[in-house]
């Protein structure tokens, strides 16, 4: 891992940026392993389901707690200078994160919000995949065209992710949960573990990134594009994307206000520094 750290500039904080992204991918690898193991269980039960799901939750909680390394741990001026050397690379291109999403929920829940109502859970992956939300997240703000970041990612991983989408239609976390005995599906520990997973992946983790983006990229008069050209103002906030893995576990009000309060509180505190 250390040998792979090859900064493109002489700014010390670029090493912080690279190192933390490596740490993130290591935790993603651990989370993926647990999700894949769950799908391979021949006799899935509540105990094994909770064991592995709680492991996934701990990995994400560790990442969320440690994200201050990114938010507070780099000099803004240095970041704005070395970031240009990283183009078109972006955290957006983490294929492991996309895999975690596919292993977590029905593909319909990952369809971009504006198109989700046009499909159903029974639609094949080939029909749903072209409208997965992140395909609309790395577009040029002025033209709406795909960025080089997105184009390169699609060329390298689209077929692999489509194949995985098909595989996960019956083996994602939600479908595995539905295979548990009815009594176990009502177990508070199981429900709370799923809800924690939903919040960790779809609220707290994206918002940690949003907090960092506001600190480094937001200005009072204009916003700077992210390293991969991601339209981060619309891509990161949960209230815009409404990515909810397990909507059946949440109340109407909870879904309507998904991530809203956290965003408003965090952004107010950060903007005070400008």
Where are these regions (language model features)?
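Surface-exposed peri-terminal alpha-helical interaction modules
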Residues: 1-274
